[in-house]
């Protein structure tokens, strides 16, 4: 199915008929993309299996994939995205660079902090 092989952005809804949960997971995971997916179920065990088995950056349970939740790390798997999570706390590592600075105003030569030899 072409619809299950392309990454679609836009106001599109695709419905595919499958005969089992396992087939649905195979279809969803059988493409090269993995940005997001959604499953609607009243079965909590099925929801947890979906969370475990679906190969996407974000899995929605009983909610549509209308966009990333800004408080959650957002990004895809496989051929989707750029390999980074672009929201939530994980965005700090994507959009910032750590820099450590040590300043000593004592004017004295300091022993290394790992030097435990008595003077």
Where in the sequence are the language-model features?
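Conserved C-terminal structural/oligomerization subdomain of aldehyde/semialdehyde dehydrogenase
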Residues: 1-119
